[in-house]
Amino acid sequence: MRRNLASVGVGTGPTPSVGKPRRERRGGCHTAMPYAVFASPQVAGVGHSEQELRNGKMGYATRTYAYADTAMGSAMNETDGFVKVLADPESGNILGCHIIGPHASMLIHEVVVAMKSGAGTVGDIRDAIHIHPALNEVVHRAFSGQFHAHE
């Protein structure tokens, strides 16, 4: 699994506190560690890649949704961007999410929060109400609808 060292450093640095100084370190699991490549288009992701799941011989399900199939993506004339979700077909747990397109580095954070703070399931994002028209609808729609199982 890829790790963004700057994000790891910020995420495990001293814990901020109110009132008195504390130097406790945050640590923990890095499965929900996001990464981003600031190229054109942007690339961002969190969790496992499809290749990692295939190599580990894990069953998984995928769903891909194009930016162009949302109102904002269409208004931006975005024809190439997409979101791909990897999930456990039995539990619905989010195994990974990968985004290629404008603002990918910002859009991925909804998935990071769901994986780290929520139940970590597809339903955490699918069941949340999203603003229309907004670009993050592409993330919502990628988590909604029919997933395709892979063995």
Describe each model-derived feature in a short phrase.
Residues 1-31, 92, 134:
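Rossmann-like dinucleotide/flavin-binding elements
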Residues 21, 38-151:
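Flexible, glycine-rich terminal cap/loop adjacent to redox cofactors
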Residues 32-37:
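Helix-loop-beta segment of a Rossmann-like dinucleotide-binding subdomain
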